[in-house]
Amino acid sequence: MGMLEGKVAVVTGSGRGIGREIALLMARQGAKVVVNDLGGTEAGAGSDQKVADQVKDEIKKAGGEAAANYDSVSTWAGAEKIIQCALDHFKRIDVLVNNAGILRDRILFKMSEEEWDGVIKTHLYGSFFCSRAAAVHFREQKSGRLIHFTSTAGLIGNVGQANYASAKLGIVALSRSCALDLQRYNVTSNCIAPFAWTRLIATIPTEDPAQKAKKEKLAKMSPADVAPLACFLASDAAQNITSQVFGVRAKEIFLFSQPRIVRSIHDSTGWTPEKLAAMLEPTMKSHFHPLDVSGQYISWDPLI
């Protein structure tokens, strides 16, 4: 018997890449799966129902149970329909994986309002809308699992991804809020920052040696490596794990730190700009975080 036997899981953006691998593994672990995918391009344009249908059919061919959904996570109504799909087909929902995403990379001073809004709405709004819709049912049944996808673009930083980084770090805060609001109902909420070669990653430009090197490393990492952690976090075995941020990089799993006070200074008479000029940098500089990008911080070769 699989670790998810009898559970119903909704996996957004599961027609391709990481989401597809999660949906397939959850089905093999016994879950009934709603395969949600709009079927759009990497930038979110267009739609194609065959993308979700192919994964649904693959699950059924292997003896599992699945339903396909083609709604967009980026609207309140779309998210409601995604969760309702689970209820219509399988009468409940136990697991929500917020995986759907798009990329519209652009350097800050060239990014358009549309490029900002599109990414924020898909990642951050989408994660909230779907979590909100699922939370109503989790509260009633006093159980549930929320698994969100963040990124080192938000946790650490990347050039040309102000929209994506903002959305992905916002998802960490959303996950923590979900964990706090729903802990009394036995609901957990965790984040995964994946490292894997997907069609979204393939769109990253390689205009300099550092970008090219990063892309070459990512090309060695399979989306399938991310699925086991998602399945574990969805299971009863992970009932005591909540509000954490994990990373998966090939055969390696990380636990990320979260913001906490690392140093403080005080003045009994109060601070002035002049006092801060004299004290703040000399006292705190050794604790400052460097301005690096994720590829500089996580620079060792992946364990393929």
Regions found by a protein language model. Give the residues of each.
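A glycine-rich helix->loop->beta "capping" turn
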Residues: 5, 62-65, 85-98, 104, ...
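Active-site helix of classical SDR
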Residues: 131, 167, 175
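Residue(s) in the substrate-gating loop at a strand-loop-helix junction
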Residues: 151
